[in-house]
Design a protein with these regions (language model features):
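Active-site beta3 strand of CheY-like receiver
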Residues: 51-56
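Two-component/phosphorelay signaling modules centered on CheY-like receiver
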Residues: 16-35
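Helix N-cap/capping motif at the beta->alpha junctions
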Residues: 36-45, 66
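Alpha4 helix (beta4-alpha4-beta5 surface) of REC/receiver domains from two-component response regulators
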Residues: 23, 68, 91-106
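C-terminal output helix
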Residues: 112-121
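Receiver (REC) domain active-site loop signature in two-component systems and cognate sites
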Residues: 61
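Short amphipathic alpha-helix used as the core "switch/output" element in two-component signaling
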Residues: 45, 67-80
Length: 126
């Protein structure tokens, strides 16, 4: 099943530049309904208040990390099936294993290309 380009996507990163880059790539890929949050706590508030179809999140953020947000999403009855793509500088195998164990849908290591993001999203929604 291909991704629904009309679904609401949440981009979570404490760096405004990174949020802008990810949003621009998502728009290039056809996703027009993109919101953003600065950390996992803000993201969870938005996810619980609205209906999102997909989350793209950084790992290292203040207040609440992406991995802690992912665990909270998977523990939440309403949100637990929400696809989450982790986009992070954390390239160590132990980080990938931790993310997989926490229930990540897919994982991209920074820096990355639009093509890489497109491939990872396609795998999530196939």
């Amino acid at each position: 099943m291909p991704a629904d380009l009309n679904m609401k996507v949440l981009v979570v990163d404490d760096m405004v530049t990174m949020r802008r880059i990810v949003k621009n790539i998502l728009k290039q890929l056809g996703f027009g309904n993109v919101d953003e949050a600065e950390n996992g706590q803000e993201a969870l508030q938005k996810l619980r208040a609205d209906t999102f179809g997909f989350v793209v999140s950084d790992w290292n953020m203040p207040v609440m990390t992406g991995i802690d947000m992912l665990r909270a999403i998977r523990a939440d009855e309403k949100l637990k099936t929400l696809p989450v793509l982790m986009v992070t500088a954390e390239a160590q195998q132990s980080n990938l294993i931790e993310a997989v164990q926490a229930g990540v849908s897919n994982y991209i290591v920074k820096p990355f290309t639009a093509e890489t993001m497109q491939e990872k999203i396609a795998k999530i929604f196939k």
